[in-house]
A protein has these predicted regions:
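Cytosolic catalytic domains that perform sulfur/thiol-centered chemistry
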Residues: 1-172
């Protein structure tokens, strides 16, 4: 993620869990959006996942080297594009905990056999700005803000330019 000023691929090349495949959240997000890490188009997702060699019935464990921010976003991408939720997991504690527990890591990058992944977007999982605006006026669903308490309360600046601080009305 850009605001961390880290290079995920460089970190992956240095050490990762054996047989792990690198997923670049920045590169694999919508390019023509002013908002960060928006979902790509279906055909783009199919190309991304096919190049990773992942098949529709593969069980997937996702981890990252942060506070699970990237892995949760990656997890949601797979769920949104129709991968069976029972087959998608986030590694508890991520790479940090894995290493703290003195588990094996490697710098070997395996050769990937390209697959032919077919996505089935679950569009009902995403709400747009219009839905949120309507919910502010007439509450129909819960809105949960997963940012830090300080960001939710507007006590600290947003890490990305152009985003206002504070919460959306009717959010928790």
């Amino acid at each position: 993620m850009p605001q961390t000023k880290r290079n995920g691929f460089a970190e992956y090349k240095t050490q990762h869990i054996q047989n792990a495949i690198f997923f670049d959240l920045d590169k694999n997000s919508k390019k023509d959006s002013s908002l960060p890490h928006m979902l790509v188009e279906v055909d783009d997702w199919e190309k991304i996942v096919s190049k990773m060699g992942i098949k529709k019935n593969d069980e997937i464990v996702i981890y990252d080297n942060s506070d699970v921010i990237s892995s949760c976003r990656c997890w949601f991408n797979f769920i949104f594009f129709g991968h069976d939720p029972k087959l998608i997991h986030v590694l508890n504690g991520g790479l940090k905990k894995w290493i703290e527990e003195k588990r094996k890591v490697t710098n070997i990058i395996n050769k990937i056999e390209v697959s032919n992944y077919k996505a089935h977007p679950q569009k009902k999982l995403v709400k747009n700005k219009i839905s949120i605006d309507q919910n502010i006026e007439e509450k129909r669903f819960e809105v949960i803000d997963a940012r830090s308490k300080e960001r939710f309360e507007g006590k600290v600046s947003e890490p990305r330019k152009g985003l206002r601080s504070g919460s959306i009305k009717n959010s928790y």
